[in-house]
Amino acid sequence: MKVLGLIVEYNPFHQGHLYHINKAKQLIKPDVTIVIMSGHFVQRGEPAISNKWTRAGVAIKNGIDLVIELPFVYSVQSADYFAQGAIELLAKLKVTDIVFGSECGNINIFKDIAFTIKNNQKNYDNLVKKQMNQGLRYPDACNQALSILMNKTVTTPNDLLGLAYVKEVINHNYPIELHCIKRTNDF
């Protein structure tokens, strides 16, 4: 059975979200589609524009079979913790595929970066700490460490979040296939 997992906020739901749902379903052809959605507060700790029940209802009306709330402790955190909570839930739900939107649109780039970090974790962590000790914020320190390790950076919001999803799946060896859809101006 194919079970598609999407990680969303729908704050508010727009045409890009509908595009994401339709494109993901077209790609995976799932038997069931599940979303993990933030509750009354979204990733940056801001209150959602509309309540979680309204947003869940919109998701169901637009082809989602099941909406699961991402616990508050994860939903208001940085990309890494947001991804940790969402991916763990999807793994427990036995999701077979995850599709996310990204600016780069190339899942192999994310996998390459995630495996490089995993295989050089101690060095990467030390580089991040060093950069933070020099005054960089955590996301910037991670990017600088990545630049030193691989001569690559990930700077756009959806690419950062997508990389966090991929790292989480790879680091825990979850049996989940990862896919990304290139974002357009409409998505």
Residue ranges of model-derived segments:
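N-terminal catalytic cores of NTP/NDP-binding nucleotidyl/phosphoryl-transfer enzymes
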Residues: 1-55
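A glycine-rich helix N-cap at a beta->alpha junction
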Residues: 57-71
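Short, contiguous strand/loop micro-motifs
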Residues: 8, 42-43, 59, 73-74, ...
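Non-catalytic positions within long, well-ordered alpha-helices that form the structural scaffold/packing
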Residues: 25-26, 60, 87-91
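Active-site cores that bind ATP or allylic diphosphates and position pyrophosphate for catalysis
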Residues: 69-187
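Divalent metal-coordination and catalytic microenvironments
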Residues: 14, 59, 166
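Short beta-strands and strand-loop turn motifs
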Residues: 5-7, 36-37, 68-70, 179-181
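Receiver (REC) domain switch/active-site residues of two-component response regulators
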Residues: 31, 65, 96
